[in-house]
């Protein structure tokens, strides 16, 4: 039966937002076509009919970029889209995080949300359209989603907040905030900012929430008209009798195991307790389902005890106070041949960051759905399995590693010197060597140290800290510097990075349905206190960037030429510039305004390359005398090289004061002679005279 097409419209930040339902992808549980300006995104939500036998909620969110959306054909031999770009992976995570908490506890049906970007208007964010579409597709479907949610981008231009700023406005904005939530509360924040005070960030979040409420009302109105009845699902539940039996048996032992201060010893104590209880039920010949439930009940008891300790006794598993940071240590200059290195350790979390400086030609070229651009600052994050004492495959970066690397990049970018101040490409790599929570924030601290060790003149040091939350009813406890167990068993992971002056990055994920303004405000202020403490420690390790770069870092020499001369330096098909590079071993980057960056480890070679370029662009002046070298002899005269790339002709009649029969009677190839420029004709040919120089010398002697 043909389904009726429904169209709904609203204004969103001064641009039309139109939703079409019932025409496309009708076999999905829910499907919507979102048109935002000229951006078009198809969002679908699909669920399995039966629950999966797993101990987690199997949700997958995909943000699919199609290059036809911006009128491009993919590069390479295959000519089709390959692996998702970093931007697509980050967008998938951005959509996943606010919708994941809004499914019932025990829901185990597989859910897949796919957003296909089909057309892109650069001023109408496809990510925000996809987030809206994903929520609406779930809301109108028969999947038991407890939304809707919505998300907006907030910028601040000239002190005023702007919803979904255009590309031009974003260039002027001192923050880039993505906030998502339900109509009652915020449940996801992702932000980069130029050292913005905590109070301003909070106001921006709440400003965004007002727009979110309007978008949710729009979704609820659509769902009331075209939404399907929600499917009946069986929620996974623990056996109450078995739970009571195990609770009575091991409650005291769980309390003791949870309070073992050291991570590995605590994990070993919990594992031993689990093994003993499972063994006891195996002896009773319990079936597989019962043994699975035994393990899940023990996990639940551990979670309850950790949360009880924090909320009731204000005691954490490792014995710290709720606002106490783990012991800190740091060092710089660990790797002699690298350009800069920094080690940062916080409790059992440790990150080693390495800074590498390159020429401007080493920038990363970004060619996706956005405007083509380059990136001269990169921050990469690696999380090897040995960091948690496990074995595992060493593959390329996963979604989590890409997300953590991007968060560090966002946190550090506001303090990176401009290209004019520091004409280098900067790459940071953070290797997580030990992990017990907050590794992304440790990598930010280690990367700050590595840049200072490398001599990068950053505007201010940046530190990061992760805040946690345990909420029970109306009572809540905010934790400073959460460790792995608190992250895993708590309700919030709120990462805050910044300088002494203000915030440079925020990232908030929660497992509950939302957070109030009061909790956000308290978490931001508690994070500031912790951040300042960490910055103070880092400044004791290295108080300012080193004045000298590493001897192994490239030296960069900058020069300015007339932009009209750029083609002379490059030469036909790059022949001239390649000759200079071959002769000197340097890298040469030329800007459109005539700025040239020459880089190599050898300063003498930089100077040599500069001299060659100066000679190429040097202008020959009429009336000037030059010491040139005879390069070629013809019957009618001699061709003399004045300097690299500039020749002129001394006609036979201009070689001497007396009559010359043969050119070879006066000069030979290789001779150095003084010549005067007498004329530059319309074709740019240079005429020289040796006779004029001889005459001038005679007159001077008289």
Swiss-Prot record:
Annotated catalysed reactions: RNA(n+1) + phosphate = RNA(n) + a ribonucleoside 5'-diphosphate
Homology family: Belongs to the polyribonucleotide nucleotidyltransferase family.
Species whose genome carries this gene: Anoxybacillus flavithermus (strain DSM 21510 / WK1)
GO BP annotations listed: mRNA catabolic process; RNA processing
Entry's EC annotation: 2.7.7.8
GO molecular function, one term: 3'-5'-RNA exonuclease activity
A Pfam cross-reference name: PNPase
Cofactor requirement: Mg(2+)
Classification via PANTHER family: POLYRIBONUCLEOTIDE NUCLEOTIDYLTRANSFERASE (PTHR11252), POLYRIBONUCLEOTIDE NUCLEOTIDYLTRANSFERASE 1, MITOCHONDRIAL (PTHR11252:SF0)
Sequence positions that bind Mg(2+): 487, 493
Subcellular location: Cytoplasm
Name of the protein in question: Polyribonucleotide nucleotidyltransferase
Domain KH: 554-613
Record function comment: Involved in mRNA degradation. Catalyzes the phosphorolysis of single-stranded polyribonucleotides processively in the 3'- to 5'-direction.
